[in-house]
Amino acid sequence: MLIAGGAVLALIGATTAGCLASTGRFPGDSMDIAWQTPPDGNKSEQGNGAWLVGDLLVRSRFDAATAYDARTGEQVWDHRPPGRSRICAAEADVDRSVLLVVRDDENRPASSRRETCTVVTAVDMENGREIWRTPIPTDTAAESGRRFERSLIAAGGGLALVADQGLRAVDVRTGESRWTAAVPGNCVPGKAAPAERHVAVLLACGAPDKPRTDGEVPEGAELHAAAFAPTTGALLWSTPLGDREPVRWDELSSIVSADPLVVSASGAGDKASGAYYSFDKDGVPRPRIDFSGDHGHLNDRLRVAVVDDTRLYALAGYYVKGGTRHRAVAFDLTTGRQVWRTDLDDLPGVALHLQDGKVTVIVKGSATSAVPDEDLYVLDAATGKERDSRSFHDAVAPAGEVFAYEDLLIVARPGASSVPAFTAYARA
């Protein structure tokens, strides 16, 4: 009887293990939903930012900025623009708990299709209340074909940068004017990212003797990275991105990190070319990190990279017989050389998070799988060695941002749709 009972128990155990294996549900190696916010509903407009500030998660989209308790997912406050106005863009100075939202005219006619982002409003991220507001002068020459793409607003280091005819800084908590940047006469400012040490800005700079209208990019302009003093707006340094070959001003570019200053740039429509360019505190260029190399090809469709004081971490694909494989890669910013690389899976990583010496990667599941099969990898930032790997019980919608809060991993969705704005996962 004991033997028969043991056989039954063994059969039950084997059957249970088989079911768990088919779904990836083993005790101690999975991620379960702890809480999620209510879905936004089916709407085509996309969100424009998500942040973790203290114990609050804040998400901005076209119709409102909303905060949720990071412990429970419960709504804490909701800030809505007045009248018919819509939020065009949003940035945050998390250290000062200030959210900056750019909106259009609240009195625009219902028939108007043109979105003019003319007002910046500062919102206290602790309670959702408006602190101050200021107009953004309308750029009457914005339809020109030679305009450098700018940040409507940027925040950080206690400053709010407003893109008007130059580059103007105000105090992020009070809105009081601080300075207007001393941009060289042959340059036009573009995207900006303020930090405590300096204000990082992309410049389109041409020959000083080339004629141009105010705000228009000079003939023959190339892309520069520049740093301005956060207290005065004085130019600290300006360095061209290219070493032997200049980088054109109209290449696809962005500031990956303000300090250390790291910039990505690639030719429009060219998936293979491009690189990350980094600079030391004095503006001396470091060796570039190419998108393509021995590490494979850094994701061109979903450019995912994070930076700490000394390294850049990214996701790459590489080709082998039978298909594409994927890995996480770390590069030394000083030398541009690969420090480590760790193979992930046959499927690409879709989100990357760096915190407390750990690199967290969410790996996309198969579109043809009958069950959710997204995976989570936690790697040691120093060595790339795997610290933890788990499977999600539920499908993970495309992630815009990933946050680690206490023992939760929180995924923010980039747009307004039928999926929740935030979902928190706990290790099970």
Task: Provide a role label for each language-model segment.
Residues 62-66, 106-121, 164-168, 208-226, ...:
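Structural motif
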Residues 180, 184-332:
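Acidic, serine/threonine- and glycine-rich low-complexity intrinsically disordered segments
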